[in-house]
Regions:
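Residues that form or immediately flank small-molecule/cofactor binding pockets and catalytic motifs
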Residues: 5, 35-37, 118, 141, ...
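Short, basic, helix/turn surface patches
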Residues: 54-66, 103-109, 156, 160-175
Length: 188
């Protein structure tokens, strides 16, 4: 499934045709779900910091689509850098030590979320996509590049330059915290 944030009544969405073509070639079922999330977030609510609300709405739309089809497991594309950024965001903006987990059971919806790329860095994901000539759809969000997550990404980059190995130590500390489902990994 792909959730198109802007495809709604009368409005064209993003161009996912390269991904749809790859899925056809690989004989993998592929469904694009239209939504009005972008319209609601930016036009109706005029959110200044849209990421949290958008994430909740996307999750709700995906979970509804899964349940309508009797599907109870989804693989999400979060990677190593996403996890470290999320950990920093939780610490700095929410005063808590928290991050999503490799495997999450959602009691209310009876859905299991898995994150198979969690131990792969963003650069590895980008390099692999280029090497395999995989189609990539760039983020069309109007807030892209001007978010708290982007600020944290830049902060981590700066800190990593001053303190080499910072990301791996933060990731390692996440594994040692009493966060269920986190465990050590020998190599990422």
């Amino acid at each position: 499934f792909t959730l198109d944030m802007g495809a709604a009544e009368g409005r064209p969405g993003m161009d996912f045709s390269p991904i749809a073509q790859l899925c056809r070639e690989m004989e993998v079922p592929y469904t694009i779900l239209g939504s009005e999330i972008q319209h609601i977030i930016f036009d109706v609510r005029k959110e200044k910091n849209p990421c949290s609300m958008c994430a909740k709405m996307r999750r709700g739309a995906l979970h509804s689509a899964l349940l309508e089809r009797g599907i109870h497991k989804i693989a999400l594309g979060h990677h190593y850098d996403d996890a470290v950024e999320t950990f920093f965001m939780s610490l700095i903006f929410e005063s808590r030590l928290s991050c999503f987990q490799p495997v999450t059971w959602l009691d209310r919806t009876q859905i299991t979320q898995i994150r198979p790329l969690l131990y792969c860095g963003e650069n590895l994901v980008r390099h692999t996509a280029r090497r395999l000539s995989l189609p990539v759809v760039e983020n069309p969000c109007p807030a892209n590049g001007n978010t708290k997550r982007q600020e944290i990404k830049e902060l981590i980059y700066e800190l990593q330059g001053r303190y080499p190995g910072l990301k791996s130590r933060v990731f390692g500390s996440m594994q040692r915290l009493p966060l269920p489902e986190w465990g050590p990994v020998e190599h990422r």
